[in-house]
């Protein structure tokens, strides 16, 4: 079975083809970072228009990369939510139209389920059950995963997502959009312990997160200590350490609560090297395992959508006749396979 995956939920146009026997056959990705850089963030209207321009040419490029034609595709999977409504509609409309023209099923995919399953694209995929840390610009969630569609929300951010906090703090430090990866690079030059940021909501029971206060703490620290290059690097280090420690503490609690031995980390922030190292160290001490996708599959991409669509189709998902997207879509509402 060969599935064409279409991802257009935000500011990346991702197209991929996944074969259940041969694995990933093609992976095309276009990022709109330069388009939105002058605005300091994603402009929804510009994102939608750029998806319109790029989606079909990238599909053609993916077919060429895989050495396939339209008649070789058995299904089309597209991101149906959550995300920006206009951007989602571009991918959903193209996906549904192609499926109709090619007479194959059109499978709507939950964007965060795509991220959650992305580590299964690797050679050593995780087995169920596991705790999943979904950490990105729009989401920070801990999920108990016992099977496809068997997702229980354990905790989530009550305000900013971790990735959003990274980007906002990076802006305070004078870094360009998207600031998260640049902040991490700056943090690597920082002095450990010069500044100490709080670890929000770790002094009380529960698995929820709160990251908005760290941005305020960073702003106050910058005002009080100047903005020379080393000071900014030290502040970046303190901020990153606080976020990573908070995520690690909550992951440990989730593992203790569920009794699971496997931790899956997914979403854009899961590419963070410090976070990967800290969680790997923690799981080694616990006698467990941590799983994550390669960096290019941590951020938005078509490969995870093609794979998730294939999994859903193989477990009995029905093709959608209409074009429906859901900008807000709780993961727990997905049906169990």
UniProtKB/Swiss-Prot annotation:
<keyword id="KW-0819">tRNA processing</keyword>
<dbReference type="GO" id="GO:0005506">
    <property type="term" value="F:iron ion binding"/>
</dbReference>
<dbReference type="GO" id="GO:0002949">
    <property type="term" value="P:tRNA threonylcarbamoyladenosine modification"/>
</dbReference>
<keyword id="KW-0963">Cytoplasm</keyword>
<dbReference type="InterPro" id="IPR022450">
    <property type="entry name" value="TsaD"/>
</dbReference>
<feature type="binding site">
    <location>
        <position position="167"/>
    </location>
    <ligand>
        <name>substrate</name>
    </ligand>
</feature>
<comment type="function">
    <text>Required for the formation of a threonylcarbamoyl group on adenosine at position 37 (t(6)A37) in tRNAs that read codons beginning with adenine. Is involved in the transfer of the threonylcarbamoyl moiety of threonylcarbamoyl-AMP (TC-AMP) to the N6 group of A37, together with TsaE and TsaB. TsaD likely plays a direct catalytic role in this reaction.</text>
</comment>
<feature type="binding site">
    <location>
        <position position="300"/>
    </location>
    <ligand>
        <name>Fe cation</name>
    </ligand>
</feature>
<feature type="binding site">
    <location>
        <begin position="134"/>
        <end position="138"/>
    </location>
    <ligand>
        <name>substrate</name>
    </ligand>
</feature>
<dbReference type="Pfam" id="PF00814">
    <property type="entry name" value="TsaD"/>
</dbReference>
<keyword id="KW-0012">Acyltransferase</keyword>
<dbReference type="InterPro" id="IPR017860">
    <property type="entry name" value="Peptidase_M22_CS"/>
</dbReference>
<dbReference type="GO" id="GO:0061711">
    <property type="term" value="F:N(6)-L-threonylcarbamoyladenine synthase activity"/>
</dbReference>
<dbReference type="InterPro" id="IPR017861">
    <property type="entry name" value="KAE1/TsaD"/>
</dbReference>
<comment type="similarity">
    <text>Belongs to the KAE1 / TsaD family.</text>
</comment>
<keyword id="KW-0479">Metal-binding</keyword>
<dbReference type="InterPro" id="IPR043129">
    <property type="entry name" value="ATPase_NBD"/>
</dbReference>
<feature type="binding site">
    <location>
        <position position="180"/>
    </location>
    <ligand>
        <name>substrate</name>
    </ligand>
</feature>
<dbReference type="GO" id="GO:0005737">
    <property type="term" value="C:cytoplasm"/>
</dbReference>
<feature type="binding site">
    <location>
        <position position="272"/>
    </location>
    <ligand>
        <name>substrate</name>
    </ligand>
</feature>
<protein>
    <recommendedName>
        <fullName>tRNA N6-adenosine threonylcarbamoyltransferase</fullName>
        <ecNumber>2.3.1.234</ecNumber>
    </recommendedName>
</protein>
<feature type="binding site">
    <location>
        <position position="111"/>
    </location>
    <ligand>
        <name>Fe cation</name>
    </ligand>
</feature>
<feature type="binding site">
    <location>
        <position position="115"/>
    </location>
    <ligand>
        <name>Fe cation</name>
    </ligand>
</feature>
<keyword id="KW-0808">Transferase</keyword>
<dbReference type="InterPro" id="IPR000905">
    <property type="entry name" value="Gcp-like_dom"/>
</dbReference>
<keyword id="KW-0408">Iron</keyword>
